[in-house]
Amino acid sequence: MKHPIHVTSEIGELQTVLLKRPGKELENLTPDYLQQLLFDDIPYLPIVQKEHDYFAQTLRNRGVEVLYLETLAAEALTDKKLREEFVNRILKEGQADANVAHQTLKEYLLSFSNEELIQKIMGGVRKNEIDTSQKTHLYELMEDHYPFYLDPMPNLYFTRDPAATIGEGVTINKMREPARRRESLFIEYIMKYHPRFANHNVPVWLNRDYKFPIEGGDELILNEETVAIGVSARTSAKAIERLAKNLFSRQNKIKKVLAIEIPKCRAFMHLDTVFTMVDYDKFTIHPAIQGPKGNMNIYILEKGLDEETLKITHRTSLMEVLKEVLGLQELVLIPCGGGDVIASAREQWNDGSNTLAIAPGVVVTYDRNYVSNALLREHGIEVIEVLSSELSRGRGGPRCMSMPIVRKDI
């Protein structure tokens, strides 16, 4: 089998993608804990699943192989000791052992089949699921109004963030927010133990044990030699610097890393919520990330004199930097919402800039962003719209919901 991971651009024909079908974790959202679990609203599960299935089928209709995170994770945990190790790490990282006797919860989880185990970990464990007669410690029996022994993981359907593919390797990411930290553990075990990946020594450019956060929504592969990474509310400049050094020393094709600073707020959570590539010479952009004259902070990172030094160049014109690294004379930045102050803010909030390119000039978008979609079509882009009334409540679009595994080179 050829190498299982190959991604050298944002727009090469998508061949294999990783998704996560929304599940029980969304039904474990309650108003009291929305902020803690990073949601603004509670999606209606039957409809959000129908919309996600429609999204997956749309990709299949264009020849894309669709893999599911929950399936790969279950298939990776075939060994009994491995299952136990995985559960121990999930409980430790979820701080579940602070709420209930570790052994009680561990035994409960290990009583399930692999598929059920993964769904239960993702969905969360409510306190009323554990039989009181099985509780052997005083603190387990004390009244506590927090409803979970193990928190649900409702953000998992945004598979873009826990990891990112660069070339034939991955970053397995330390997530900034505690509610999402366990997510990348699934990717770690899949890469190490799933037969599709385990025998290929997949390079890990940056691992989840690195102390500074980085998330896949901030990682964009512009071409074989250039990666753009957002310095954002979720991704640290220190993590970008470490990743750049690792890429330059271990991945000899990457020559430049662009660190693009964006406003650190929830509406502009990741770079891909305000900026995505849709064709060889076209990008969507939310105008609010730039200053009045189109200026913003961009830092070009290149290899220094040795493995631990970098050459860093500060620039302020995104347009000029993109033309330079892509070798283009002309380039188009298509404004989300057509640049209208109301439409752009509304459609960006509903991920109008978060397009998923499945081939050069072919993108998947949410149907609700009709102003942005019309503008993309005016620029010659084929726009494939997917249903979005419930999916969009999670504040992520088609790019957020997908992790490319294989793309054709452009």
Swiss-Prot record:
InterPro entries: Arg_deiminase (IPR003876). Keywords: Arginine metabolism, Cytoplasm, Hydrolase. Its EC number is 3.5.3.6. GO terms for molecular function: arginine deiminase activity. The active site is at C400. SUPFAM superfamilies: Pentein. The keyword Cytoplasm applies. Pathway: Amino-acid degradation; L-arginine degradation via ADI pathway; carbamoyl phosphate from L-arginine: step 1/2. It holds the Pfam family ADI. One of its GO terms (cellular component) is cytoplasm. It catalyses: L-arginine + H2O = L-citrulline + NH4(+). The keyword Oxidoreductase does not apply. It comes from the Bacteria. It is found in: Cytoplasm. GO terms for biological process: arginine catabolic process to ornithine; arginine deiminase pathway. Belongs to the arginine deiminase family. NCBIfam families: arcA, PRK01388.1. This is Arginine deiminase. It comes from Bacillus cytotoxicus (strain DSM 22905 / CIP 110041 / 391-98 / NVH 391-98).
